[in-house]
Amino acid sequence: MIVLAEEWKSDPKVHFVSNSNGKEMWFRLSPAKVNPESAPIYLILHGHGTTSRPTLYAEKDWNVIAPIDNFGLDGKGSWWIGENGDFSTRELLASVVQMSKEMLGSNDDVILCIYGSSMGGYGAILNGTKLGAIAVYANVPQIKLLGSTYSELGMKKYFEAALGLNPNETFNDLNNFVKTVEGELPLFFICENRFGQRDYREQQAMSFISTLNEMEVNYHLEIVP
């Protein structure tokens, strides 16, 4: 008998990958209606705590991959990177994308775009180049984790569970990370609230925009009320 809370796992579009330690990442793959082997791929990375099931979002002209990061403290997410400073979640995400491409029979030059919100925005920026994305849309992304006002307002324990107690600053602050990326960066679409949590806009999205300006990297910025 299927437990009701896990009933979504019986969906024929739902699959999983696992690593050598038995850690599993579940995902839903919704193929495009026409020519999925050549259709672009849209990878959706959810935010903190949105882990009850993969989104049912689909597009007729796009292949949609919707994984779940239910790792980290309380199973609410590990920022699409890992647990206690490892990179296990990041590696599983790469396996999800690779398995999806194999199932779709995707062409080698298939287009990949990533959308992520909040925690997912961090994950989209972090994993964009590694996954070969041409564009990343990050909605209200976290850029700096530990040491930010957002961290001190209640998120510190979740960040520590993902990054460890002595985090690598390359991954604690994506302003540092993006400067280490070799090769071409994706086109960044950044969306931020005009009025949000204290210091969030300036410490997060706007600090990243300053870094992109410094690096002379192209981007699109949208500030919404």
What residues fall within each predicted segment?
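Alpha/beta-hydrolase active-site loop
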Residues: G82-L104
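Alpha/beta-hydrolase fold nucleophile elbow
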Residues: S106-S118
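Short, surface-exposed "cap/lid" segments of acyl-processing enzymes
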Residues: V17-S78
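Glycine-rich nucleophile elbow surrounding the catalytic serine of serine-hydrolase chemistry
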Residues: G116-L126
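Short loop/turn segments at strand-loop or loop-helix junctions that form parts
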Residues: L45-G47, A66-G72, N139-I143, C191-F195, ...
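The feature captures the conserved acid-bearing segment of alpha/beta-hydrolase catalytic domains
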Residues: T149-V224
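Short, surface-exposed basic-aromatic patches at helix termini and helix-loop junctions that form
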Residues: Y57-K60, N127-I134, S210-E214
